[in-house]
Design a protein with these regions (language model features):
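An N-terminal structural lobe/cap that precedes and organizes the functional/catalytic core
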Residues: 1-71
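Short, well-structured alpha-helical interface segments that form or flank functional binding sites
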Residues: 12, 103, 107, 190-192, ...
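Short alpha-helix boundary/capping motifs
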Residues: 31, 84-86, 136
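Short, low-complexity, polar/charged sequence segments that are solvent-exposed and flexible
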Residues: 31-34, 76-78, 216, 224-227
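Mixed-charge, polar/low-complexity N-terminal
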Residues: 36-38, 43, 93, 178-179, ...
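Catalytic cores of phosphodiester-bond-cleaving enzymes
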Residues: 44-122
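C-terminal, charged low-complexity interaction regions
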Residues: 122-259
Length: 259
């Protein structure tokens, strides 16, 4: 079996689509049974795995980790100040400055590409045209990010409840402890098609086509200026989160809740 990225090396490693750090974040310090909850029509259950499979060779896996994964983990889960990123929160949005465009864009591209080629059920709804997958593969292999308007990713900051000025560390951690199966959405009236991931306290909404330069200029997607504006959303205002809550509650009523 050859590496799915470079198509050459055969020392294939276990690769995580959503990096393992995001799953470990929601487990306890002793790495006991997973604390995150999987919600599906089959029922609610505690997750215990971080969904990996053999995809990349050791060299490509290490390149991903070194070039952008470690950076994004620090930005989302730990302390953005450690990588020089500043943030300013208002009631409706968070403005991040001094982000590394190359690293964040490559991470977004790798997320979509790996999820789309995965054989795991967790990612079964991520479907991308072969031509796009090949463009992603080549660019990721060369570690060259797309332009901001190509396969743009809109990042909403997700909280369980609307945050106030005195947000506690516990509330902050809780806001980053949700991981959802990615979902593909097609809106024919609006002419858009996108895949949504939720993990690390963000909704990552990746369009499967180009976007208007308006979104780039307004800092709605990551761009070379390093400024990104993330709207603040919560369960009540987020369709995917609200839908998962309805399914979870329905499972409980049917006797398919957590055992």
């Amino acid at each position: 079996m050859k590496c799915k990225l470079c198509l050459e090396n055969e020392d294939i490693q276990e690769s995580h689509i959503i990096p393992d750090a995001f799953f470990r974040f929601v487990k306890d310090k002793n790495d006991n049974v997973g604390k995150y909850i999987e919600v599906s029509e089959a029922g609610n259950k505690l997750g215990q795995v971080s969904y990996s499979e053999k995809l990349l060779c050791r060299k490509c896996e290490q390149n991903f980790s070194k070039e952008f994964e470690s950076y994004v983990i620090e930005f989302t889960l730990r302390n953005p100040k450690n990588i020089g990123v500043s943030s300013k929160r208002s009631t409706k949005q968070i403005t991040f400055t001094n982000l590394d465009y190359r690293k964040l864009k490559l991470f977004q591209m790798s997320l979509l590409w790996r999820a789309a080629i995965s054989s795991l059920d967790f990612y079964k709804y991520v479907q991308v045209e072969p031509e796009i997958l090949e463009l992603l593969r080549k660019s990721l292999c060369e570690l060259t990010p797309f332009e901001p308007h190509i396969l743009p990713c809109f990042m909403d900051r997700v909280f369980l409840n609307s945050p106030d000025k005195n947000l506690s560390l516990s509330d902050l951690k809780q806001s980053k402890s949700s991981i959802f199966n990615p979902k593909k959405t097609v809106s024919k009236p609006l002419g858009i098609e996108y895949v949504t991931f939720i993990f690390g306290g963000f909704e990552w909404r990746i369009w499967l086509h180009k976007c208007s330069e308006f979104y780039v200029h307004e800092k709605k997607v990551i761009n070379p200026s390093g400024v990104l504006i993330s709207p603040i959303v919560n369960i009540e205002t987020n369709e995917l989160l609200r839908g998962a809550g309805v399914i979870a509650r329905g499972n409980e009523l049917k006797g398919k809740g957590l055992k």
